Amino acid sequence: MTENHTPSTTQPTLPAPVAEAAPIQANPAPSASVTATAAAATAAVNNAPSMNGAGEQLPCQWVGCTEKSPTAESLYEHVCERHVGRKSTNNLNLTCQWGTCNTTTVKRDHITSHIRVHVPLKPHKCDFCGKAFKRPQDLKKHVKTHADDSEIRSPEPGMKHPDMMFPQNPRGSPAATHYFESPINGINGQYSHAPPPQYYQPHPPPQAPNPHSYGNLYYALSQGQEGGHPYDRKRGYDALNEFFGDLKRRQFDPNSYAAVGQRLLGLQALQLPFLSGPAPEYQQMPAPVAVGGGGGGYGGGAPQPPGYHLPPMSNVRTKNDLINIDQFLEQMQNTIYESDENVAAAGVAQPGAHYVHGGMNHRTTHSPPTHSRQATLLQLPSAPMAAATAHSPSVGTPALTPPSSAQSYTSNRSPISLHSSRVSPPHEEAAPGMYPRLPAAICADSMTAGYPTASGAAPPSTLSGAYDHDDRRRYTGGTLQRARPAERAATEDRMDISQDSKHDGERTPKAMHISASLIDPALSGTSSDPEQESAKRTAATATEVAERDVNVAWVEKVRLLENLRRLVSGLLEAGSLTPEYGVQTSSASPTPGLDAMEGVETASVRAASEQAREEPKSESEGVFYPTLRGVDEDEDGDSKMPE
């Protein structure tokens, strides 16, 4: 009895899981699909028991079709080929007749995508939880529930094997909280310092252990200055080579301030190899820092990539070329420092001004200027400023001295050295005075002789103040005020015809009785005419901007020349070019001026040739063996042996 009762109790329990499983599998279908109707959901529910049956026969519920398929794939292909058809075979049907569904589309792709709602075919699986979906758009909506859009990337619809890149999470493990947790469970243990990843929190950069993942990422650290694009560096390199070639061929006059400024203008907008160390073209790249290395944590275990070199400059072949180029650059520096236009634009030629350039020291040599941190002094010849004059680097420096070397005393560029030889004494003066010497304004010819007309500077100043253009300093209180205003004298005899009020003492005088003559006429114009005041203010602003632009351009030229000289000196110290190479090329060439600079290396080439001629003489004098004479050297025509 127990044996017969046991199967009787087990048989009724078999349909129970099937009846309960039907609504469980039918619930995702209407929630996952948006365009399916209620009839399509009912058809999917009715199809569930037949799918779970013992024979797994899936009947086609198309109107008038009784065919059954063993798998969902075959059923889907049957509906698409038999009932939907194709346009090429003239049997295209764009209306769904599955059960009571009458959905109509406009394209075949739309109707075939709609049929997936009815067919229990779920080829699209979720990589996080393993859930399958019928359509790719349903999977895309489901993936958004796992993480934020900024942290996930759903698999592509056409990816057939997504597990190759991101292995599926094994059953029984909790769902991932972000996109990369399940495939790198073994890697996350390396980041012991990082908290477990959560929503809306930054995560360390992951790295997949399988060979299908991406490699390490390296960030090259820049040092000092941005490298820029290689094309820009190549342009600057070529421009610098062309500039050195122009120096060798004397294409422009280094003594002309305009020519030097115009030639340097083409180099200021380019990226030149100017750094404190070697040129960036001759440096190797810094060691990259690896992010997320496989050795655990953030490591830098990557080999250093090799550096690259630019070809040598064609216009700088020998050491003599570098020396001569440095001499030309020094000459260009002196031209910029000694130019009258620059002196006038910098405000040195202002009346009574004593200017000392902050970045220069007065020297008696032709060496390049040395920079210092001292401030620029603009000292005026007045009594309160007399103490500041003593702090000048050169006590014997005359007034209106340009900010340059001591060549101003001998180059006839100083306006003081023209009309008098003892106005600005040289350095042999024993006891210099506390106050700077001022040039004597004798006549108009001597005044204008020191300043060329091109500079546009003011003539040498006399003992007048430096603020004569400011009216507020000319008129002080208690001076130039009239004792009796003219307006009051003209109106005092007029009869008062105004209506009297109750209190005559409280009557306020009219505006015509208020005399404005207490204000100086020179000052009243500025306060009464706002348009004139604004025009003056605008003109002053424009003048300041123009002067600032001139000063900025001058500073850029000075810095460019200093960087060029620093580059040349660095190449000379490196010793990459030997002087013997230049001597050999100059002596071996048929024309001695071919490899040398025109007008510069002529003396060195001649000296080298003379030295080469003298060497055979010295060798002949030191020979201890007898020399055989030729036949033509004998007077009798017979050759004789030496005695």
Curated annotation (Swiss-Prot):
Transcription factor that mediates regulation of both acid- and alkaline-expressed genes in response to ambient pH. At alkaline ambient pH, activates transcription of alkaline-expressed genes (including PACC itself) and represses transcription of acid-expressed genes. Specifically recognizes and binds the consensus sequence 5'-GCCARG-3'. Pfam families: zf-C2H2. This is pH-response transcription factor pacC/RIM101. Keywords: Activator, Cytoplasm, DNA-binding, Metal-binding, Nucleus, Repeat, Repressor, Transcription, Transcription regulation, Zinc, Zinc-finger. Its main location: cytoplasm. Residues 484-509, 611-620 have a biased composition (Basic and acidic residues). Induction: By alkaline conditions. A zinc finger (C2H2-type) spans 58-83, 94-118, 124-146. A motif (YPX[LI] motif 2) lies at residues 625-628. A motif (YPX[LI] motif 1) lies at residues 435-438. Activated by C-terminal proteolytic cleavage by signaling protease (probably palB/RIM13) at neutral to alkaline ambient pH. GO terms for molecular function: DNA binding; zinc ion binding. Signal peptide: none annotated. Residues 139-161, 354-373, 384-432, 452-509, 602-643 are annotated as: Disordered. Binds to DNA.
